[in-house]
C-alpha cells in the first residue's frame, strides 16, 4: 500500500510542477532534488533486492559507502550498468518534464504544493522507511531489556550420549520443499524431512541473513552485529570472545568438533569463528585438495557438494568407529546464488519451471539429492542409533534465478531433526527463528534449553513468539550485541607481528591489512575482504579531518606520501588525516611497536582532493619510477602506456590471464630501442612448461621455454621498424581457480611474470 501511495504522491508532484508551477530556478532545483531522491531510493531498493533478496538490509548500509567486490561479481556487472543507465535516463527525463512550461510565470502555491507532495512521496516510500530504521539501529544505545532475554547456558552437557551431525544447506530454505508450488523439486530430501521433527515456521531476522551470520545465529543464539561489516570478519583474531556458543559447550562436554566445507575457510572469517568456539578440526578448500580424489573438480567457490559430502561421510565413519564423542558440521555450496552449480554425480541435473530450465532450481534439486544420499548412508549405518542429524538452511535464498517464484510463497528457513535414538515424525508449526536452532539442539543433547537469545522449540518460548515486532526488537538490541565483542574504544600504542601478519592494540588483534578510523571514544576497523573495496578506496571515503591508521603493503600508500618505498612489498604504517598531515613508517622489525600521533592541523582542501584522487586511481593506471616492469606491485613503470592480458598482483608477481586477453601485451609510450635485450624473469603454469612460448616485437618473433619454477631468459631483438609493443603468447592457457578470489570465475593461466626489463644494446 505504501508503494502505491508514494508513487501516487510522486506522480502528482511531477504533474503539478510541470503544468502549474511555472518558471523559477530555485523551486525547480528543490523539486528536482527531492524527486530525484525518490528515484534514487527506489532504485537502491530494487538493486538491494537484486543482491540480497531482502530489500535494504544491514549489509546494504555497509555497501552504500564501500564498493562491492569479490564473490561472483562478474554476474552482477550487467544489472549494475543497467541501473546506472536507467538512473541517468530517469533524471534527464524528469528534468525535461519539469521544465515543459518553463516560460509560464511562476506560481508560489503550486510550487510549494509540488515540493510538499515530493517530500511526502519520499517519506511514504518503503526504501526511506528501511533506511531510516537502519540508521536508527546504528545510533541507538541499546535496549534495557536485552540483559533479561540474553541468557548464557551451562558450559557443559551432563552425561552426553549422542553424536551430532549438523548439515547447513546453502540458501536451502524450506520454501523449496513445497511440492504444490515446486512439484518433484526435492523428492529425496523431502521424504527424509517428512520422517523428522520438522519445524515449519523458522523466520529470518536482521543479522542472520548471510552464511556466517546464519552460522553465528544458529550456534550462539545472537545475530551477527559487529563494529565492522560482517563478511569482513576474516580479519579479526577472535569472534564474540566472551560468548558461550554451541561448539564451546560440546567441547567442554568431551566432544571433538569437526567442520567440513568446500570453500575456503577464511572467507568471512568462518575459520576464526569456529576456532574461537570449540572447533579444533576444520576442513575447507585448502585442507581438502590433498585428500579428495580429484582436486581439479571444483566450482567458483570450491569443491562441489558431492565431493564435500563424500568426505563428510568418510569422517563420520572414521569418528564413529573410534568410539569417541563427536560433532560433525558441514556446509554445502552448490545452491549459492545467483545461479548455483550442478555436481556431476547427481541424477537430478535439470529442473524445468515455467516451461524452461531454471538453473537455481536445478542446483537445488541436485544438491538435495546429494544431502539425502549422505543422510541415508548414516541412517543405514550401525551408528545412527547414537546420532542426531540436523538439516538447516544457513539463510533464505538471495536473488537467484528462482527468487521471483520463491517470493510468491510464504518463505521460511529449513530446520528439521532426525533422532536415531528416538525416531519422531512431527511437523511443529511454532513460531521461531534461526537463533533458536542451537538451543533446540542443545536441549535434544541433554543441555539447557536456552542459548543467548535462542530458546528450544521443544521446551521454551521463542523471541518470535514473545515479540510481535521481533525484527524491530532485534535491531533495537544491536548496540547491546555489538558490545559483546568487547571492542576497544581507543588506540594509543600498537604492535605489528610480521610473522603472524597481525596488529594488536588495546587487547584486540586483527589480521593485516587493516584500516582504522579513529575518533573520540571509538575505533572503527575497516578490514579488507572479498565483499569490500581495497583499503585505499575505503580511505578515500574518509572526511578531510578523520583520523586514520592504515597498515598495508608499502607500495599502496608510498605513491602518496613516501615515494622511496613505492616498490616495496613490506608492511608500512600510515597515519594522519587526508586533509592534514600524513606520515608513513616502514615496519622493519619482526615485532614492531608503534604509537598514534594525530595532530590538530589546519585542513587543506586542495591536499585532501589530491589525496582522494590519487587513492582512487585504478590499479592498471598506476605508474611508478623503475627501469623494469615489476609484477608484484600494482601498476606499471612510467614508460608503459598500457598493458593487457595480465591478472592482479600477487606476492611473487602476476599471471597472464587469457580471460583478460589471449596475449600479454605491454605497449610503451615511446618506440623500443633499435637493438635491445628483453630480460624476462618468469615461470610457466601447468602444461605450458617446456613448450615454446612466442615473444614478438613488431614483425620479429622469438621463443622462450619456461619451467614451473622461476627462471630468467634473455632474448636479443632488433627493432628496425620502431615497434613499441611487447607481445607474449602463452601456448596453452589453463582454466583454474588456483589462487583465485573466492567466488570469481576461473582464470586461464599461462605464464607467471616476475619482472620484464628492456636493456638497450650498443651498435
UniProtKB/Swiss-Prot annotation:
Pfam families registered for this protein in UniProt: DUF7024, Sulfatase
Catalytic activity: a phosphatidylglycerol + a membrane-derived-oligosaccharide D-glucose = a 1,2-diacyl-sn-glycerol + a membrane-derived-oligosaccharide 6-(glycerophospho)-D-glucose
Subcellular location: Cell inner membrane
Pathway: Glycan metabolism; osmoregulated periplasmic glucan (OPG) biosynthesis
GO terms, molecular function: phosphatidylglycerol-membrane-oligosaccharide glycerophosphotransferase activity
Broadest EC class assigned to this enzyme: transferase
CDD domains: LTA_synthase (cd16015)
Protein's UniProt keywords contain Transferase: yes
Main location: membrane
The keyword Membrane is assigned to this record: yes
Keywords: Cell inner membrane, Cell membrane, Membrane, Transferase, Transmembrane, Transmembrane helix
UniProt record, GO biological process: glucan biosynthetic process
Membrane topology annotation: Multi-pass membrane protein
EC numbers for this chain: 2.7.8.20
Record-stated family: Belongs to the OpgB family.
Protein name: Phosphoglycerol transferase I
